Amino acid sequence: MRHGYNLPMEYWLSLSPLPGVILWILLYISDYYFTIYTARGFRDLGHFRFEGSFELTPQFQKDVDLLKPVSKRHIILLVLYSLLIVFIWWLTRQFYFFPWTYLFYLGMFLLMEVGIHLRHLRNASLIREMRKGGGLDGEIRYRKWFSYRISASEFYTFAALFFLFAILAYSPFFLGGAVMCFATGFQHSRLARKAKTSPVVMESNV
């Protein structure tokens, strides 16, 4: 393969912005609907309460709490990020080392969503098992700072895994995913510290 990287997938992704945009659209849309599904599932089970909101991303908390099937903010960001991917592809092709730089940024977008989907699948599996056979009694209350801290730990784990792949495969795509997951984990660690020192707000069933 050219440019030192050795994954055919990366060569295919760098030929055009279209594959990256399509993957991004699919992942971003399914991310939102997985969130709605799991939020509704935890609400129906009645065993889980989350301080403030089940959703950790502030700009989506209201829509998720209302279980909106369509989010105007989500659609706007979907379009903007899709255009940004196309712009990055064009910009790196014109002015920067290509395709290494584009693959790095594309990995930031796509692999963070992969990590998020792994969490969605875990939650969906938990909900399905509890609906089938129970297995949990009483009520579990998640403080906001604890939810952020658990999320940070998971993102740090994903970052380490993607970084290992990046080293073994000499992959800018996985390196981008590692950087983005680490940055998100760091952000959630800061939010956890902030939430722990903030007054307790209303608790939500989802």
Label every model-predicted segment.
Residues 2-206:
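Hydrophobic alpha-helical segments at protein termini of multi-pass membrane proteins
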